[in-house]
Every structure is written in structure tokens, then in C-alpha cells.
Amino acid sequence: MNEGVAEASERMLKGAGAFAHETPYAVGKHYRQINSSPDVYLVRVPFLNISTSETNCYLICDGDECLAVDTGAPTPEGAAPLDAAIDELGIDKARMSFFLTHLHMDHAGLIDHVAPKEAPIALSLTDFNLMAASSDAEYLRITEAQVSAEGFDCDLVYKSARYGMGIPSFKPEGRNLKFVAEGDVIVVGQTKLEVVDTAGHTPGHLALFHRGSGLLFSGDHILFAISPGLGLRLGVVDTMGVYLANLQKVCDLGISRLLHSHGEIRPDWRERVAWLKNHHCERIEQAAAYIAEHPGATGADVVKNLTWNVPQAWEDIYPAQKWCIVEGGIIILNHLIAEHRIAREPDANNIHHYTLL
């Protein structure tokens, strides 16, 4: 599932501008044109982590206007190719606007660097509120209680529960924020792009659809390099159900090309959607089967006995990966609850136990 650290490092060191062999369109040192009408330029912004080495950021240009879809992570190594691509293309930052598919650091982290204060920034109100709430101590306390109730050690929460939470991706004060949702239209020159709700990876994850060309700027909704993580967030009853429904929504849109955020752009996105659906459904059934064989199992029992692409020993798993597994496992349990397939009962210590219905 995850690209090795050595391989990711090698890719990052090659730089974001190694595009010459990949396109019939215009190629610059730090960008690659991937579409005309509208003109779309791909900029790879490096950011080395466990599973990906770059964020695919897109510049949509029409006349003297430009919309940037995501910005990448806030590192000097990331800022350099994005700045260089903007300069190479002769884009006036005063005529730029921004669209954030979601507010994870590797997507929104360069806003403070690249976006002028007055630049319009289109984003999800749901994810914005989440970013604000997750920096509050009460949010972490409630998350700790939720995870502890599944039978995981409190130490795991303190080491891992703030992964992806509690650190704002940018400073919103004084920003020209434009909260958008399903059906809203963003205009760049003469180009109109429709906002599509693709919640799942985050509760407010958004995509942009250009109906004329069939392009979908899809963020982390569908990836080839990894299976997108589904975030455990307070107040969301069935993240898995929402995500699976939104995978189907993309298939029904009539898109021609999926422009995702990590890894190479590929044409076989429908096959990938089918794989992702099957991948999640297999794990859901595995959880149900374990509960059938072990009635009264705790959430931790179930999650630790599912198949994950990680070291076999729980203690050997990276904290960030461990947190993603805990999130994903609880989301599966929540989905089975929402589907009325299992029951969740707390014991005297408020530890949840599961049985089939």
C-alpha cells in the first residue's frame, strides 16, 4: 500500500519538473500542461511522508485569471517549484484564486506563503470548522474518550490522536474565504467549474468538475498510490457509507479524466474505484466475521485482527500508521452499526463490546 521511504526520497530528489517525456502539451521546468480549453498545468509539490512523496497541484488558467487547486505542504522544498511554476507561466498573483479540496497540511499548507491576503479562497465550511475545533483541548478529550472506549490504550491517543488534527494548515485571520458546497460554481475567466461533494477522506472533502472537458479535480477522494484514509471525526455517523456513496457519485458524473492529488495520472480510474469498493467491502465483511466468531469482542480486538498492510506486530507499526488503522477500524464498526448488522454494548468500565444482530 505504501511506497517505501527510499523510493519516495528518490522521487522527491528528482524534482517536480521531470516532465519532458510525459506530455504532448507545453512543458516547463516546474510544470506540465495536461489539458487545453481550459489550460491546466500540473505542478508537483514535494512532501516526503510515509506513503506519498508529492502533492499534485493544478493551475487552471483562462485569460489573465488563474485558479490554483491545492497548494501543497509548507516546506521550502515545496514552495520552490510552486513559486517557480507561477513565475514561468507569467501568472499574476493578484489575479489568482484558490480552491482547497480539503485542509490537510499537504494540500492547504502553502496558502500562507503563496496566496495574497485578498485572494479568494474557496473551501468547505465543514472542514474549516473541523480545523478550528480540532485545535481545542476539548476536541482531543472527546476523541480520546471515543478511542479509549474501543479498548485502545490511552497512550496511543496521546501519541497518535493528533495526527492530522490540532495544527491549522493556514492562518484564516484576514483571509478572503469563500465557503462553497455541492452545486456551487467557480468561474475562472470564461471557465465554469462545478463544486462536487466528495466527503469521506474528510467530512467536507470537495472536488471540482469541468463539464465541458469532463475533468474532475478530485483531491484525495480516489488515489492509486494508496487507499485514501477515512478520517474519524466527531459527529459523523457513517463515514464509510458516505465515502462508498461518493465513489459511486464520481462514476455517475460522466468524467473523462481524474486529476487526483498523489501519484501519476492514470486512465484506469474506474477500475480503481471498483478496487477501492471491493477493498473496503472485504474488510467490512472480515470485521463482521470476526465478531460472529468472537461475540463480545472489543473494538480493539476486532481492529487488530483485520488485515492491514503493516508489520504484523502492533508495537512495530509507525504511530501515524497506527492512528490511521484505529480510525479506519472504528469507521468500519460504525458502518456495521449504521447498517444494523452489529450491536455495541458498553461494559461497567465503558468499554464497547460487539455482537452480531
Regions found by a protein language model. Give the residues of each.
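Active-site/pore-lining binding-face segments in mid-to-C-terminal subdomains
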Residues: A79-P81, A85, L89, L103, ...
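Histidine-centered divalent metal-coordination motifs
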Residues: S97, T101-H107, H201, H205, ...
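Short Pro/Gly-enriched beta-strand edge/turn motifs at strand-loop
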Residues: L13-K14, S37-V45, Y163-S169, G189-T191
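C-terminal regulatory/interaction regions
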Residues: M1-P24, Q286-L357
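A short catalytic or substrate-binding loop motif that flags glycine-/basic-rich loops and adjacent residues
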Residues: I50-T52, K178-V180, A199-T202, A348
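Metallo-beta-lactamase
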Residues: C66, A73-T75, M165-P172, K192-I284
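Active-site HxH/HxHxD metal-binding segment of metal-dependent hydrolases
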Residues: G4, A8, E77-A79, A84-I186
